[in-house]
Amino acid sequence: MARTTPIERYRNIGICAHVDAGKTTTTERVLFYTGLSHKIGEVHDGAATTDWMVQEQERGITITSAAVTTFWRGMDAQFTEHRINIIDTPGHVDFTIEVERSLRVLDGAVVVFCGSSGVEPQSETVWRQADKYRVPRLVFVNKMDRAGADFERVVKQIRTRLGATCVPIQLNIGAEENFTGVIDLIKMKAINWNEADQGMTFTYEEIPASLAAKAAEMHEYLVEAAAEASDELMDKYLEEGTLSEDEIKKALRQRTINNEIVLATCGSAFKNKGVQAVLDAVVEFLPAPVDVPPIKGIDDDEQEVERPSDDNAPFAALAFKIATDPFVGTLTFIRVYSGVLESGSGVYNSVKQKRERIGRIVQMHANDRTELKEVRAGDIAAAIGLKEVTTGDTLCDPDHKVILERMEFPEPVITIAVEPKSKADQDKMGIALQKLAAEDPSFRVETDEESSQTLISGMGELHLDIIVDRMRREFGVECNVGKPQVAYRETIRASVEAEGKFVRQSGGRGQFGHVWLKLEPNEEGAGYEFINAIVGGVVPREFIPAVDKGIQEQMKNGVLAGFPVLDVKVTLFDGSYHDVDSNEMAFKIAGSMGFKKGALEANPVLLEPCMKVEVTTPENYMGDVVGDLNRRRGLIEGMDDGFGGIKIVHAVVPLSEMFGYATDLRSATQGRASYSMEFLKYSDAPQNIAKAIIESRS
């Protein structure tokens, strides 16, 4: 079967945004205009096509990123048909992992901002993630019909707060309730969308006289930005004072793909104005898979290799999301980087080192699907029938093995105990948690050996709320939830030498292991380091890995209060052995004893996770917000001015003090403040708090 759409006409894009910027409504309009979704779903009715999990519909926020394939011929049917694969990404801070995951597999992104609230703390997080993966992007300033909407102010914020060179290619005509349409600053025409057919058709009109001067000035800025793409264009621009429409578009496209500029559009998705032009901009300015550098990976010989976006290259794809579907079981969403994959064929999972067979391949629309015979370079689709895959695995041609870049997932910071309400729920809970953990690498499940409770850990309270909620809805498991626990850690602050000696003579063959260890604090974040400094074979070589293992096991179990130990450098420098009685077990125990003894003498401290917190609040609640953060042992690091009397407070606060913060902040500010929180670092817990925790654990 030949390729139906040439790869140059593919656009793999994400739509990213802050929680309330109107991203889901924007995606809905995209589906509507691309002719796939005939009734526009509104988020406030809980009926949007991409928000297909029930909780999303209830909470009105997007949680799982669904991949949707659409086709677009242009607002004026001016293009040959392009295939646009859209990955919907969540904007809530507890789900930044989903955003990271989708940015990995995209070639470009549309970032949606709210016309009145502009750049919010969460938008900065998303923007930094897009910078990290060097994703070319366009900006859509939405909600231009809202009170306080101001396109130019948001553009200015993007320049100052996000440090991007933002080039508007549109100007709004009117704002708030007078918002009627936009000016296309490249064509220098006003666009008037037809309200009778929900904006499916439009007319070009002359620019309103009151905006002519402003539009001319912005057109000039845009042409200058285009001219900077190359010396030839710059020379032409300086000589003739202008460039052709075609030259402008090509140059802006090139600079967007190089991440030098960010083009800005505006509109109101809700009022059916603007999204049509965003789709045109996606086609004109965002890259096709062949316009971005080929993905790199590591082959069997540990050599770096590239996989170009080409059907003739060996097959390679990345599994970027696992979802459980009530009808077909597990769906593995994959981005195909190179080659062709036919349904029913075998693939190799190079991360797990296992062969698997793909049952069926389906292309997802927001909530229905078409079956495909094959997928090719550039495609995004879902595979059915894969058993062993987890998020971030590479699937490749068994004869050309490669591991594409691994995704790095953050460590969870909050843990709660869950117990099934009845015996019947017990077995179902295990299966449910296993499936949910395969879908979401930032969520962990473990059993506490002492209390034999099941513990689940995640990125925040909302994250775990939703997991518990999904267990109830999707798997019918009712469970009781314990109080949240913080993931404390331990470390040492001094260097010591310590002896670990394990001798057991009780008739028959004895046990003998003896080591001397030097324990030193390692740099923050450097983790555990083991150095073998044995000379002259005083500890035989075959027992050294056992010593290392014993130390690591003891580190996992902690020395003060049973929390894992971080950032320690251990040197094995001396010891002795017995010809007959020494074995691996004895040296493992000796290593563990030596570490515990040493760590207790090396000024051990308890570490608590500290979060970077940003609160956006109206100025009149500022005092209350700061006072409350101080009460929570927060360290105020600074304040910025937002627009319209809004203040942004930056603070570092211990996680243990942040439980229930969302509710407290809402009631203190009558729901007008919002906050974002992400893990920053581990810091020493104050003595009184450490003492209380150690006593409660002993």
Swiss-Prot record:
HAMAP family: EF_G_EF_2_B
SMART domains to which the protein is assigned, alphabetical: EFG_C (SM00838), EFG_IV (SM00889)
Subcellular location: Cytoplasm
GO cellular component: cytoplasm
Functional description taken from the UniProt entry: Catalyzes the GTP-dependent ribosomal translocation step during translation elongation. During this step, the ribosome changes from the pre-translocational (PRE) to the post-translocational (POST) state as the newly formed A-site-bound peptidyl-tRNA and P-site-bound deacylated tRNA move to the P and E sites, respectively. Catalyzes the coordinated movement of the two tRNA molecules, the mRNA and conformational changes in the ribosome.
Keyword Flavoprotein: no
Species annotation: Shewanella sp. (strain MR-4)
Keyword line: Cytoplasm, Elongation factor, GTP-binding, Nucleotide-binding, Protein biosynthesis
A Pfam family recorded for this sequence: GTP_EFTU
Keyword Secreted among record annotations: no
One MF term in the entry's GO annotations: translation elongation factor activity
Record-annotated tr-type G domain positions: 8-290
Listed Gene3D superfamilies: 3.30.230.10, 3.30.70.240, Elongation Factor G (Translational Gtpase), domain 3 (3.30.70.870), P-loop containing nucleotide triphosphate hydrolases (3.40.50.300), Translation factors (2.40.30.10)
Family: Belongs to the TRAFAC class translation factor GTPase superfamily. Classic translation factor GTPase family. EF-G/EF-2 subfamily.
GO biological process: ribosome disassembly
Residue numbers binding GTP: 17-24, 88-92, 142-145
Protein name as it appears in the record: Elongation factor G 1
